[in-house]
Amino acid sequence: MKSLHIKICGLTSLVDARAAVAAGADAIGLVFYAPSPRAVSVAQARAIALGIGPFTVATGLFVDADPGFVQSVLAEVPLQLLQFHGSESRAYCESFQRPYMKAIRMRPELDVVAAMAEYPSASAILLDAYRPGVPGGTGETFDWGRVPQHTSRPLVLAGGLAPENVANAISATRVYGVDVSGGVESAPGVKDHEKIHRFITCALQASAQLNSKGD
Protein backbone atom coordinates (compact mmCIF):
# COMPACT_ATOMS: atom_id res chain seq x y z
CA MET A 1 0.00 0.00 0.00
CA LYS A 2 1.34 3.43 -0.96
CA SER A 3 1.50 6.31 1.47
CA LEU A 4 -1.90 7.64 2.47
CA HIS A 5 -3.04 11.01 1.18
CA ILE A 6 -5.24 13.21 3.37
CA LYS A 7 -7.57 16.02 2.29
CA ILE A 8 -9.31 18.41 4.66
CA CYS A 9 -12.35 19.82 2.87
CA GLY A 10 -14.74 22.69 3.44
CA LEU A 11 -12.18 25.21 4.65
CA THR A 12 -13.40 28.78 4.96
CA SER A 13 -10.47 30.57 6.60
CA LEU A 14 -6.73 30.79 6.10
CA VAL A 15 -6.18 30.12 9.81
CA ASP A 16 -7.96 26.76 9.53
CA ALA A 17 -6.22 25.94 6.26
CA ARG A 18 -2.80 26.57 7.74
CA ALA A 19 -3.70 24.45 10.75
CA ALA A 20 -4.59 21.60 8.40
CA VAL A 21 -1.30 21.96 6.54
CA ALA A 22 0.67 22.12 9.79
CA ALA A 23 -1.03 18.93 10.97
CA GLY A 24 0.05 17.11 7.80
CA ALA A 25 -2.76 17.50 5.26
CA ASP A 26 -1.74 16.86 1.66
CA ALA A 27 -4.68 18.77 0.20
CA ILE A 28 -7.35 21.25 1.22
CA GLY A 29 -10.81 21.65 -0.27
CA LEU A 30 -12.57 24.90 -1.16
CA VAL A 31 -16.31 24.62 -1.80
CA PHE A 32 -17.80 26.64 -4.67
CA TYR A 33 -21.40 25.54 -4.13
CA ALA A 34 -23.62 28.28 -2.74
CA PRO A 35 -26.12 26.07 -0.82
CA SER A 36 -23.30 24.61 1.29
CA PRO A 37 -22.61 26.13 4.73
CA ARG A 38 -18.94 25.73 3.79
CA ALA A 39 -19.14 27.73 0.57
CA VAL A 40 -16.46 30.35 0.00
CA SER A 41 -16.28 33.42 -2.19
CA VAL A 42 -13.67 33.71 -4.90
CA ALA A 43 -11.84 36.28 -2.78
CA GLN A 44 -11.82 33.99 0.26
CA ALA A 45 -10.63 31.06 -1.82
CA ARG A 46 -7.86 33.08 -3.45
CA ALA A 47 -6.52 34.22 -0.07
CA ILE A 48 -6.55 30.66 1.26
CA ALA A 49 -4.99 29.09 -1.84
CA LEU A 50 -2.22 31.68 -1.93
CA GLY A 51 -1.56 31.36 1.78
CA ILE A 52 -1.06 27.62 2.25
CA GLY A 53 2.31 27.29 0.55
CA PRO A 54 3.37 25.55 -2.66
CA PHE A 55 3.34 21.92 -1.54
CA THR A 56 -0.32 21.55 -0.54
CA VAL A 57 -2.89 20.77 -3.23
CA ALA A 58 -5.61 23.42 -3.36
CA THR A 59 -8.77 21.68 -4.57
CA GLY A 60 -11.89 23.41 -5.85
CA LEU A 61 -15.19 21.56 -5.31
CA PHE A 62 -18.03 22.22 -7.75
CA VAL A 63 -21.53 20.73 -8.08
CA ASP A 64 -23.01 20.82 -11.59
CA ALA A 65 -21.66 24.33 -11.98
CA ASP A 66 -22.01 26.46 -15.09
CA PRO A 67 -18.76 26.12 -17.05
CA GLY A 68 -18.39 29.87 -17.15
CA PHE A 69 -18.43 30.01 -13.36
CA VAL A 70 -15.73 27.36 -13.11
CA GLN A 71 -13.60 29.29 -15.59
CA SER A 72 -14.09 32.52 -13.64
CA VAL A 73 -12.88 30.79 -10.48
CA LEU A 74 -9.87 29.33 -12.28
CA ALA A 75 -8.95 32.79 -13.53
CA GLU A 76 -8.66 34.07 -9.96
CA VAL A 77 -7.81 31.12 -7.71
CA PRO A 78 -4.66 28.97 -8.13
CA LEU A 79 -6.31 25.55 -7.94
CA GLN A 80 -4.23 22.45 -8.65
CA LEU A 81 -7.16 20.02 -8.67
CA LEU A 82 -10.85 20.24 -9.53
CA GLN A 83 -13.39 18.09 -7.69
CA PHE A 84 -16.74 17.49 -9.36
CA HIS A 85 -19.41 16.37 -6.93
CA GLY A 86 -22.54 16.34 -9.07
CA SER A 87 -23.70 14.50 -12.18
CA GLU A 88 -21.04 15.99 -14.44
CA SER A 89 -20.17 14.06 -17.60
CA ARG A 90 -16.70 12.96 -18.59
CA ALA A 91 -16.69 15.57 -21.38
CA TYR A 92 -17.60 18.32 -18.92
CA CYS A 93 -14.89 17.26 -16.46
CA GLU A 94 -12.27 17.15 -19.20
CA SER A 95 -13.28 20.46 -20.75
CA PHE A 96 -11.32 22.54 -18.23
CA GLN A 97 -8.05 20.78 -19.08
CA ARG A 98 -7.09 20.50 -15.43
CA PRO A 99 -6.51 17.44 -13.24
CA TYR A 100 -9.82 16.43 -11.70
CA MET A 101 -11.29 14.09 -9.11
CA LYS A 102 -14.80 12.77 -9.72
CA ALA A 103 -17.05 12.05 -6.77
CA ILE A 104 -19.33 9.03 -6.96
CA ARG A 105 -22.20 8.83 -4.50
CA MET A 106 -22.69 5.27 -3.32
CA ARG A 107 -26.33 4.66 -4.17
CA PRO A 108 -27.53 1.22 -3.01
CA GLU A 109 -27.95 -0.12 -6.54
CA LEU A 110 -24.77 1.43 -7.97
CA ASP A 111 -22.25 -0.67 -9.89
CA VAL A 112 -19.18 1.07 -8.49
CA VAL A 113 -16.66 -0.32 -10.97
CA ALA A 114 -18.86 0.61 -13.92
CA ALA A 115 -19.36 4.12 -12.54
CA MET A 116 -15.62 4.55 -12.13
CA ALA A 117 -15.04 3.40 -15.71
CA GLU A 118 -17.07 6.35 -17.00
CA TYR A 119 -14.25 8.69 -15.95
CA PRO A 120 -11.00 7.12 -17.21
CA SER A 121 -9.25 10.49 -17.29
CA ALA A 122 -9.93 11.30 -13.63
CA SER A 123 -6.83 11.69 -11.48
CA ALA A 124 -8.76 10.05 -8.65
CA ILE A 125 -12.24 8.78 -7.81
CA LEU A 126 -13.87 9.89 -4.56
CA LEU A 127 -16.45 7.57 -3.02
CA ASP A 128 -19.01 9.36 -0.85
CA ALA A 129 -22.15 8.45 1.05
CA TYR A 130 -25.48 8.82 -0.74
CA ARG A 131 -28.47 10.76 0.49
CA PRO A 132 -31.18 11.73 -2.04
CA GLY A 133 -30.98 15.39 -2.98
CA VAL A 134 -27.76 16.06 -1.06
CA PRO A 135 -24.55 16.17 -3.14
CA GLY A 136 -22.18 15.61 -0.22
CA GLY A 137 -21.28 16.64 3.29
CA THR A 138 -23.96 14.40 4.77
CA GLY A 139 -21.86 13.28 7.72
CA GLU A 140 -22.95 9.72 6.98
CA THR A 141 -20.82 6.67 6.24
CA PHE A 142 -21.57 3.89 3.78
CA ASP A 143 -20.73 0.19 3.68
CA TRP A 144 -16.94 0.18 3.26
CA GLY A 145 -17.17 -3.37 1.99
CA ARG A 146 -18.40 -1.90 -1.30
CA VAL A 147 -15.07 -0.19 -1.98
CA PRO A 148 -13.29 -2.01 -4.84
CA GLN A 149 -10.20 -3.81 -3.55
CA HIS A 150 -8.46 -4.62 -6.82
CA THR A 151 -8.15 -1.47 -8.89
CA SER A 152 -5.28 0.63 -10.17
CA ARG A 153 -7.37 3.77 -9.80
CA PRO A 154 -6.55 6.06 -6.87
CA LEU A 155 -9.61 5.90 -4.60
CA VAL A 156 -10.41 8.54 -2.01
CA LEU A 157 -12.82 7.64 0.78
CA ALA A 158 -15.27 10.22 2.11
CA GLY A 159 -18.54 10.19 4.01
CA GLY A 160 -18.87 10.44 7.76
CA LEU A 161 -15.17 10.11 8.54
CA ALA A 162 -13.92 11.37 11.90
CA PRO A 163 -10.96 10.83 14.25
CA GLU A 164 -12.91 7.99 15.88
CA ASN A 165 -13.43 5.87 12.75
CA VAL A 166 -10.78 6.82 10.21
CA ALA A 167 -8.35 4.08 11.30
CA ASN A 168 -10.99 1.39 10.84
CA ALA A 169 -11.96 2.90 7.49
CA ILE A 170 -8.40 2.77 6.21
CA SER A 171 -7.86 -0.78 7.47
CA ALA A 172 -11.08 -1.92 5.80
CA THR A 173 -10.59 -0.22 2.44
CA ARG A 174 -6.85 0.36 1.92
CA VAL A 175 -7.66 3.45 -0.10
CA TYR A 176 -5.26 5.93 -1.68
CA GLY A 177 -6.68 8.79 0.37
CA VAL A 178 -9.28 10.01 2.83
CA ASP A 179 -11.35 13.19 2.72
CA VAL A 180 -12.97 14.77 5.77
CA SER A 181 -15.02 17.88 6.41
CA GLY A 182 -17.71 17.77 9.09
CA GLY A 183 -15.83 15.21 11.18
CA VAL A 184 -13.20 17.80 12.09
CA GLU A 185 -15.48 20.77 12.76
CA SER A 186 -16.83 22.60 15.77
CA ALA A 187 -19.56 24.11 13.55
CA PRO A 188 -20.25 23.93 9.80
CA GLY A 189 -17.33 25.63 8.08
CA VAL A 190 -15.40 26.13 11.33
CA LYS A 191 -12.62 23.60 11.80
CA ASP A 192 -11.53 22.24 15.17
CA HIS A 193 -7.73 22.21 15.04
CA GLU A 194 -7.42 19.51 17.69
CA LYS A 195 -9.79 17.25 15.74
CA ILE A 196 -7.79 17.84 12.57
CA HIS A 197 -4.62 16.83 14.38
CA ARG A 198 -6.24 13.70 15.84
CA PHE A 199 -7.77 12.73 12.49
CA ILE A 200 -4.47 12.97 10.65
CA THR A 201 -2.54 11.23 13.42
CA CYS A 202 -5.00 8.32 13.51
CA ALA A 203 -5.06 8.07 9.72
CA LEU A 204 -1.29 8.00 9.36
CA GLN A 205 -0.91 5.46 12.16
CA ALA A 206 -3.40 3.15 10.47
CA SER A 207 -1.62 3.54 7.15
CA ALA A 208 1.76 2.83 8.75
CA GLN A 209 0.40 -0.34 10.34
CA LEU A 210 -0.78 -1.60 6.95
CA ASN A 211 2.57 -0.77 5.38
CA SER A 212 4.43 -2.57 8.16
CA LYS A 213 2.51 -5.73 7.28
CA GLY A 214 3.76 -5.48 3.72
CA ASP A 215 0.33 -4.77 2.24
Swiss-Prot record:
Keyword Amino-acid biosynthesis in record: yes
Q: Name one Pfam family in it.
A: PRAI
Alphabetized UniProt keyword annotations = Amino-acid biosynthesis, Aromatic amino acid biosynthesis, Isomerase, Tryptophan biosynthesis
The pathway entry for this protein reads as: Amino-acid biosynthesis; L-tryptophan biosynthesis; L-tryptophan from chorismate: step 3/5
GO MF annotations for this entry? Answer: phosphoribosylanthranilate isomerase activity
What span is annotated as the signal peptide, if there is one?
A: none
Reactions performed catalytically: N-(5-phospho-beta-D-ribosyl)anthranilate = 1-(2-carboxyphenylamino)-1-deoxy-D-ribulose 5-phosphate
Q: What is this enzyme's EC?
A: 5.3.1.24
What's a single GO BP term from this record? L-tryptophan biosynthetic process
Looking at its record, which EC class is this enzyme? isomerase
Alphabetical list of InterPro entries matching this protein = Aldolase_TIM (IPR013785), PRAI_dom (IPR001240), RibuloseP-bd_barrel (IPR011060), TrpF_fam (IPR044643)
- What family does the database annotate? Belongs to the TrpF family.
Q: What is this protein identified as?
A: N-(5'-phosphoribosyl)anthranilate isomerase
